[in-house]
């Protein structure tokens, strides 16, 4: 009898310990890093961002530490191009070509936070911040830092058949 009771108690404790975490316990501030390009052939020489028509325009340029954004300059342009010039990231207005921001020489990345909720990049609308990093071949890789809820809202329409 003791043996049966001990086994039952162990089973109950095991099931209780491995129970699933409730959905409300998940951190809604979780940010994902989505590689929009990778080093090598798919990296860019001059990647571009553009505000979605009808949304707020402008951007804030800065850096990231982990997934925390730290802005240093506001830009009012609606379309930006990022290049590596003289060992520094250079942000310019896509339409006029005027230089709007230049990072410190040797900086390994810059981050751009759009003022709008959606931004065009490579023919798709994206939520979140964009981080530009140096690729080993001298070009630029782009990473989208996006909240998990915005990511799921953006991905599901492409992943689920409407029928």
Regions found by a protein language model. Give the residues of each.
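Conserved, single-site charged/polar hotspot
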Residues: 2-163
């Amino acid at each position: 009898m003791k043996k049966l009771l001990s086994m039952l108690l162990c089973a109950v404790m095991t099931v209780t310990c491995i129970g699933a975490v409730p959905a409300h316990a998940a951190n809604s501030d979780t940010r994902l890093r989505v590689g929009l390009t990778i080093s090598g052939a798919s990296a860019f020489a001059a990647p571009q961002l553009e505000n979605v028509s009808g949304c707020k325009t402008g951007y804030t340029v800065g850096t990231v530490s982990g997934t925390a954004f730290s802005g240093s300059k506001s830009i009012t342009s609606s379309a930006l191009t990022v290049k590596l010039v003289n060992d520094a990231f250079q942000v310019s207005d896509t339409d006029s070509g005027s230089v709007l921001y230049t990072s410190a020489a040797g900086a390994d990345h810059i981050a751009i936070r759009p003022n709008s909720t959606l931004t065009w990049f490579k023919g798709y609308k994206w939520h979140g911040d964009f981080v530009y990093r140096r690729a080993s071949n001298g070009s630029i890789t782009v990473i989208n830092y996006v909240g998990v809820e915005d990511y799921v809202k953006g991905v599901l329409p492409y992943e689920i058949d409407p029928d």
